[in-house]
Curated annotation (Swiss-Prot):
Gene name per UniProt: surE
Cofactor note: Binds 1 divalent metal cation per subunit.
Organism this protein belongs to: Hyphomonas neptunium (strain ATCC 15444)
Name recorded for this polypeptide: 5'-nucleotidase SurE
Keyword Zinc: no
Cofactor: a divalent metal cation
Binding site for a divalent metal cation: D8, D9, S40, N92
Spans traversing the lipid bilayer: none
C-alpha cells in the first residue's frame, strides 16, 4: 500500500514524525509532501495567485511552499510516480473537532485527497490546557494504527473523510474508540487580542481561549472529554437537507 503523508503544521512538525511511525506499522511505501511552514487554520485554501515551490527533503519527501491542499495536489499530480492508495493527514497539534473542522488545514488536506479519489484520514492529538509542546504524542503512536486498520478493512463512501482525534490522556488511560458525530461547542473559544506596536498602530492576535463545553453524548467533543479516541465520518457536501426540503416547499415561485 502506497501512503501519502501530509499535514498543516509543517514539514518539521513533530506530529508528522509521529504520523510516519504510525504509517510504518501499515506499509513500508511511505511518501511525504507537507507545507514548508505552518499552515494551521488555512482550511481548504489553494494557491492561485502566486507560484508554489517544492524542496526535496528526502528520497520520497518534499516541503511545499503552499497550503496543505497544495501539497496533496502537487504530490499526486507531479511528485509521486503513481497515485497513493491512502492519504493520512496529521498528526495535528491539537484536536480538530466540532467547529474546528470547517477551517482545519489537516482536515482540508484529507478532503482534497478524497476529492482526488483517494481514501483519506485526518488525525489529531488533543491538547487540553497543556503548555505548548507538551502533547502526549505517545497516545497517538499507541492508538494510531489501532484506529486506522479497522477503517482500511471496510469500504466507506467515496465522498467521506475519516476524522480521528486522540484524547489528551496517557496511552494506558485511553478508554477505547468511539464512532461519533461532529459536535458543536456551547461557548465561543476563538478570541482576539488587540495590541499596539511601537509606532502606535493597532495589531491583533487571533487564537483560542481554553474553555470546556458541555457536549452531547455521541459527539466528537464528548468522546475526547471522556478519554476515548473519536472517529467521525465527514463529507464535503454542506447542504442542510432537512431545511432544503422546507425551503423548497415554502419558496414563492
Amino acid at each position: 500500500m502506497r501512503i501519502l503523508l501530509t499535514n498543516d503544521d509543517g514539514i518539521n512538525a513533530p506530529g508528522l514524525s509521529v504520523l510516519e511511525e504510525i504509517a510504518k506499522e501499515i506499509s513500508d511505501d511511505i511518501w511525504i509532501a507537507a507545507p514548508e511552514e505552518e499552515q494551521s487554520g488555512k482550511g481548504r485554501a489553494i494557491s492561485l495567485t502566486h507560484p508554489v515551490r517544492v524542496r526535496k527533503v528526502g528520497a520520497k519527501a518534499w516541503a511545499v511552499s503552499g497550503t496543505p491542499s497544495d501539497a496533496v495536489l502537487l504530490a499526486t499530480r507531479d511528485l509521486m510516480p503513481d497515485m497513493p492508495d491512502l492519504v493520512l493527514s496529521g498528526v495535528n497539534r491539537g484536536q480538530n473537532i466540532a467547529e474546528d473542522t470547517s477551517f482545519s488545514g489537516t482536515i482540508a488536506a484529507a478532503m482534497f485527497g478524497m476529492q482526488l479519489g483517494v481514501p483519506s484520514i485526518a488525525l489529531s492529538q488533543a491538547q487540553n490546557f497543556r503548555e505548548r509542546g507538551s502533547l502526549s504524542w505517545e497516545t497517538s503512536k499507541a492508538w494510531g494504527a489501532k484506529a486506522i486498520r479497522p477503517l482500511l478493512e471496510m469500504r466507506w463512501p467515496k465522498d467521506v473523510v475519516m476524522n480521528v482525534n486522540f484524547p489528551d490522556v496517557e496511552p494506558g488511560d485511553v478508554r477505547g474508540i468511539q464512532i461519533t458525530r461532529q459536535g458543536f461547542r456551547d461557548e465561543a473559544i476563538i478570541h482576539t487580542d488587540r495590541r499596539e506596536d511601537l509606532r502606535g498602530n493597532d495589531y491583533y492576535w487571533i487564537g483560542y481561549r481554553g474553555k470546556l463545553s458541555k457536549p452531547d453524548e455521541g459527539t466528537d467533543i464528548r468522546a475526547i472529554y471522556d478519554g476515548y479516541v473519536s472517529i467521525s465520518p465527514l463529507h464535503v457536501d454542506l447542504t442542510h437537507e432537512p431545511f432544503l426540503k422546507t425551503l423548497k416547499e415554502s419558496w414563492q415561485s
